[in-house]
Curated annotation (Swiss-Prot):
A Pfam family: Ribosomal_L14
Species assigned in the record: Novosphingobium aromaticivorans (strain ATCC 700278 / DSM 12444 / CCUG 56034 / CIP 105152 / NBRC 16084 / F199)
Gene Ontology BP annotations: translation
KW DNA-binding (keyword) present: no
Role noted for this protein: Binds to 23S rRNA. Forms part of two intersubunit bridges in the 70S ribosome.
Protein name from the UniProt record: Large ribosomal subunit protein uL14
Keyword line: Ribonucleoprotein, Ribosomal protein, RNA-binding, rRNA-binding
The keyword rRNA-binding is assigned to this record: yes
GO cellular component: cytosolic large ribosomal subunit
Assembly and binders: Part of the 50S ribosomal subunit. Forms a cluster with proteins L3 and L19. In the 70S ribosome, L14 and L19 interact and together make contacts with the 16S rRNA in bridges B5 and B8.
Family to which this protein belongs: Belongs to the universal ribosomal protein uL14 family.
Molecular function as annotated in GO: large ribosomal subunit rRNA binding; structural constituent of ribosome
Amino acid sequence: MIQMQSNLDVADNSGAKRVQCIKVLGGSKRRFAGVGDIIVVSVKEAQPRARVKKGDVHRAVIVRTKKDVRRTDGSVIRFDSNAAVLVGKNEEPIGTRIFGPVVRELRGKGFMKIISLAPEVL
């Protein structure tokens, strides 16, 4: 469950290390975002000489959350950290690699590029 002011790790090689959610997209009064949702983020920490700089505003897809993700079969999956992947306007990832596992729910939301780049899909 991600809301405004939430800090997330970045799970790709775009150059950003930490980002902060500044808007949850999808509705005028929407407060929370979960796995597979798109948010607007501000880069708070970045690597030097990277594609993205500190202070840049980008869209991101949430790939891991500390909050439980419930499946239809009754199983639950949760992670140790909140993480996102930076995407462009056409919802394609900015980076060329994804670090760490991502959830299977991204497939249903149409993020096949992220699924194919991820080393593990849970």
